């Protein structure tokens, strides 16, 4: 009798989470909360949104980038957060974890584009970019982790 492990793992919205410098980042995180991670030390860039009414902004330093979009409610919403240090996912992946560690934690049902491995939830419709989590790799070792929130496609 032989049993093989299931390489498919179910991705839940709660899996789209990472702790950066001790602050939890999820698809529901407020931009103000995320800005506390920077401790006031970040650069800002902005551009008129092609999809939303208002300005899209990027807040970044050497190890963290936060991308936002203007919501229909007038508030600034998280589009994507990308961390290169002091980060751990809800399933225990950190900088320096191997691709095998990622597969053990998240399964093998991912999309690989170059050196980026992505796991996504289904989008609510075909006009949306799906929420997901991704891992940037170098020699199959994690060098950055990102979370993407569902948002309108451009």
Residue ranges and their predicted role:
Residues 6-46:
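N-terminal, intrinsically disordered, polar/charged segments of Gram-positive cell-envelope systems
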Residues 28, 90-105:
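Secreted/surface-exposed cysteine- and glycine-rich disulfide frameworks
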Residues 18-25, 86-93, 132:
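Second-shell loop/turn segments in exported
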Residues 32-72, 99-141, 147-154:
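A cross-family detector of function-defining hotspots
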Residues 14-15, 64, 77:
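N-terminal trafficking/processing presequences and adjacent post-cleavage segments
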Residues 2-3:
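C-terminal motif of bacterial Sec signal peptides marking the signal peptidase cleavage site
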Residues 6-12, 71-73, 152:
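Ligand-recognition elements built from short beta-strands and adjacent flexible loops
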């Amino acid at each position: 009798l032989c049993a093989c492990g299931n390489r498919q793992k179910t991705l839940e919205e709660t899996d789209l989470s990472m702790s950066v410098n001790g602050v939890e980042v999820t698809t529901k995180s407020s931009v103000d909360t995320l800005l506390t991670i920077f401790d006031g030390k970040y650069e800002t860039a902005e551009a008129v949104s092609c999809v939303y009414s208002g300005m899209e902004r990027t807040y970044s330093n050497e190890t963290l980038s936060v991308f936002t979009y203007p919501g229909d409610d007038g508030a600034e919403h998280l589009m994507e957060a990308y961390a290169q240090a002091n980060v751990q996912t809800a399933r225990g992946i950190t900088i320096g974890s191997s691709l095998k560690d990622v597969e053990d934690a998240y399964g093998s049902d991912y999309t690989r584009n170059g050196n980026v491995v992505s796991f996504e939830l289904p989008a609510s419709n075909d006009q949306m970019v799906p929420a997901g989590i991704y891992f940037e790799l170098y020699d199959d070792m994690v060098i950055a982790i990102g979370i993407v929130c569902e948002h309108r496609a451009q």
